[in-house]
């Protein structure tokens, strides 16, 4: 089975549309979204509509949780709070109800894949996995994570290989899974990459070949940025799209 996995769209319709168009060449059998459909960008409803139509299952991200009243975001910085408040006012009843019902994780038993937005440890706290020491916390739940655990949240592409007693960070490039290891993979961001590559990030996992692939695609950043400004959101949310941070 060829699985398309993407995350952190952040209301960037132009990036999401480019990713879904690129996926058409990948012979994808099923799609999964790892959360944060909303937040930061100018097209929350349009992106929610597309994700609902495309993904078999979508995971709850922290911005999704904030917009839908499922977490306290009073500690977020002012511009981020403003965007979340604006999106809450913009979302249709259907899309708001959808966000309210999203799960924190999903285990795909048939392919031994765990899906979450952030770390699988303390799911409701949406913790990051940037480095091996953070991935090492997952060793305590070795029997509960998948052969591969796919996450978003950091907006970075990261790969960590785990044994029951050791964690190693691998290069963020295509790789084949080894049977005696487990993997935590951060799939990057569709709508707001933060690795100084402004192209939208998306991934493919071939569960038959046990092969994971990272993909990037260019999109109309100028239009996406213009929509941020027209929505009267923070100017930096538009500017950062051009530099990929």
Predicted features and spans:
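Acidic, His/Gly-rich catalytic cores of divalent-metal-dependent hydrolytic chemistry
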Residues: 162-245
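Active-site neighborhood of phospho(di)ester-bond hydrolases with catalytic His/Asp-centered motifs
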Residues: 6-7, 31-36, 57-62, 148-153, ...
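Beta-strand-turn-beta hairpins that frame and shape the catalytic cleft
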Residues: 1-4, 107-114, 178-183
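Active-site neighborhood of divalent metal-dependent phosphoester bond hydrolases
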Residues: 53-116, 120-122, 126-145
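Anionic-ligand binding region
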Residues: 134-174, 180-184
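Metal-dependent catalytic neighborhoods of phosphoester/phosphodiester hydrolases
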Residues: 37-54, 68-76, 126, 160-165
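N-terminal active-site segment of His-dependent metallophosphoesterases
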Residues: 1-56, 229
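Active-site environment of divalent metal-dependent phosphoester hydrolases
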Residues: 10-15, 39-41, 65-68, 107, ...
């Amino acid at each position: 089975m060829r699985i398309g996995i993407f995350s952190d769209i952040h209301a960037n319709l132009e990036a999401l549309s480019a990713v879904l168009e690129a996926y058409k060449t990948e012979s994808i059998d099923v799609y999964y979204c790892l959360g944060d459909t909303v937040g930061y960008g100018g097209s929350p409803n349009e992106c929610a509509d597309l994700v609902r139509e495309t993904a078999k299952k979508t995971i709850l991200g922290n911005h999704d949780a904030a917009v839908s009243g499922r977490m306290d975001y009073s500690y977020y910085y002012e511009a981020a709070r403003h965007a979340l408040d604006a999106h809450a006012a913009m979302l249709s009843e259907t899309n708001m109800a959808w966000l309210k019902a999203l799960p924190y994780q999903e285990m795909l038993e048939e392919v031994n894949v765990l899906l979450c937005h952030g770390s699988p440890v303390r799911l409701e706290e949406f913790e990051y996995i940037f480095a091996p020491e953070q991935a090492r916390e997952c060793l305590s739940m070795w029997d509960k994570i998948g052969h591969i655990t796919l996450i978003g949240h950091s907006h970075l592409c990261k790969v960590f290989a785990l044994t029951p007693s050791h964690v190693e960070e691998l290069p963020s490039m295509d790789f084949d899974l080894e049977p005696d290891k487990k993997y935590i993979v951060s799939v990057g961001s569709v709508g707001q990459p933060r690795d100084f590559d402004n192209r939208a990030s998306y991934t493919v996992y071939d569960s038959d070949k046990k092969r994971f692939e990272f993909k990037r695609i260019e999109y109309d950043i100028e239009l996406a940025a213009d929509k941020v400004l027209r929505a009267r959101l923070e100017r930096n949310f538009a500017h950062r799209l051009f530099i990929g941070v």
